[in-house]
């Protein structure tokens, strides 16, 4: 059970924007994909193009149904051409694992669900680099956006990627459960503020990031959700949902996501009607 807030959503939101915040994101899923056909398999099941990847780099993408709607949005990281790490949304762990497994028939790939064995923390904010550098044995300035490294926090082994869900600079870290409390406390001691799911949601909304079940879902396509840049032609590769998505990308859709800017005080709730 993840806390919605530790102190207040506003304070935690502002702490991430002005200094640094720490999020426990251990509820998210983590899979390991291994085998000689991993890249071929992911090219078939993802809408983004893995030819744009390289070892030590991650990529944001979606898995889609044949009708183009979204199974899940996620990030995967290429450790080597036969080994990928994948981070998926918490609500979709079982569904994603089953979806991946159901499409393995023709591919030499093994999928391991590490979700319950590993913990995850997001360390986000303008001071994230500076504060984290004193704790790790790698030069963080050499880890560019969406790249990752294996290193240690005070002798505890971690996987660290320059990714995030706040719109700020920062990192997402994965490690064995046994190190969780020590790593969390080490990060807190840098002066960063713990932040809950409420601030995580307000920060991602401010940064215009999609959340599964809201801006994207099994009834919304990436093109409708403003993610048409993820839909790649991948010449010669017939990936799941390609026909529908490429048509939507070229011809447009009947509906699309838009942002609203309030001119007066108020809160726009999900499913509110728009009258004009």
Where do the model's predicted regions map?
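A generic structural motif
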Residues: 34, 64-66, 263, 275
């Amino acid at each position: 059970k993840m806390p919605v807030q530790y102190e207040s959503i506003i304070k935690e939101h502002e702490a991430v924007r002005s200094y640094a915040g720490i999020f426990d994101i251990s509820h998210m899923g983590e899979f390991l994909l291994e085998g000689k056909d991993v890249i071929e398999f992911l090219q078939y099941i993802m809408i983004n193009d893995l030819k744009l990847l390289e070892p030590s780099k991650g990529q944001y993408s979606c898995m889609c149904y044949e009708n183009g709607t979204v199974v899940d949005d996620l990030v995967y990281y290429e450790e080597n051409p036969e080994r990928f790490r994948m981070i998926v949304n918490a609500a979709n762990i079982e569904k994603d694992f089953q979806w991946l497994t159901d499409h393995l028939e023709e591919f030499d790939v093994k999928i391991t669900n590490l979700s319950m064995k590993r913990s995850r923390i997001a360390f986000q904010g303008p001071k994230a680099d500076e504060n984290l550098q004193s704790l790790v044995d790698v030069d963080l300035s050499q880890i560019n956006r969406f790249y990752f490294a294996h290193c240690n926090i005070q002798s505890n082994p971690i996987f660290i990627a320059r990714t995030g869900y706040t719109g700020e600079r920062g990192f997402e870290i994965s490690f064995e459960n046994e190190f969780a409390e020590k790593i969390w406390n080490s990060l807190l001691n840098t002066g960063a503020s713990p932040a809950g799911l409420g601030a995580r949601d307000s920060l991602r909304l401010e940064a215009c990031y999609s959340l599964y079940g809201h801006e994207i879902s099994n009834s919304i396509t990436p093109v409708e959700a403003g993610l048409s840049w993820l839909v790649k032609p991948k010449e010669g590769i017939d990936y799941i949902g390609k026909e529908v998505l490429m048509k939507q990308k070229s011809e447009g859709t009947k509906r699309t996501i838009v942002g609203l800017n309030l001119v007066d005080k108020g809160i726009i709730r999900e499913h509110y009607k728009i009258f004009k």
